[in-house]
A protein has these predicted regions:
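Short phosphate-binding loop-to-helix
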Residues: 60-126
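Residues in the short beta-alpha loop(s) of Rossmann-like NAD(P)-binding domains
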Residues: 34, 41, 58-62
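Structural beta-sheet core signal
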Residues: 12-14, 56, 105
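Conserved core of the sugar-phosphate nucleotidyltransferase
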Residues: 113-165
Length: 165
């Protein structure tokens, strides 16, 4: 599993922010007595992908920094801090820093993202030379998406308000 992702320069990004207008501090909400929403997602990804390139991709906002640094250290995953509102720029900057051609988008509020779907999507994404790959065959909360760096760079120019991504 890991070899295919590595050979094709595909990284797994957990896209998350500590603050939310709808549910404040949702990333730190405890699922059980021991772990929070973000940790559950990391544990699921690490179980299937071992020490593969899993990155928490979040914003530079002050209350994000300490929270995610602690989790990154605890779980030995990279943490990338980028623009708060321009998520596409944050992702592009992270991909370029890590020398990736594609990334799997796993959102921080979808702790049940299906790791096996990631591999199937990745294979189809590469085989079909897609810029974007998704699935409708899974319930909400389980769906990963895959984007190419080339596709993001091409389409970022078409976005009217980059602060709403």
């Amino acid at each position: 599993m890991n070899n295919f992702l590595k050979e094709n320069k595909i990284g797994i990004f957990i896209i998350t922010r500590y603050n939310s207008k709808r549910l404040r501090q949702k990333a730190s909400i405890k699922i059980s007595n021991q772990i929070n929403l973000t940790e559950l997602l990391i544990e699921r990804m690490k179980y299937y992908f071992n020490n593969f390139d899993i990155t928490i991709c979040t914003s530079k906002r002050n209350n994000n920094i300490n929270f995610y640094k602690k989790i990154g250290t605890k779980y030995e995953v990279d943490v990338f801090f980028g623009p708060e509102k321009n998520m596409i720029k944050r992702v592009i900057d992270c991909m370029e820093k890590k020398n990736l051609k594609h990334f799997v988008r796993v959102t921080g509020d979808n702790p049940m993202t299906d790791p096996l779907a990631i591999l199937n999507l990745a294979k189809n994404h590469i085989k079909n030379k897609n810029e974007y790959t998704y699935t409708d065959s899974l319930p909400h909360g389980m769906k990963p998406e895959i984007f190419s760096l080339a596709g993001l760079k091409k389409n970022i120019k078409k976005i009217v308000n980059l602060n709403s991504t």
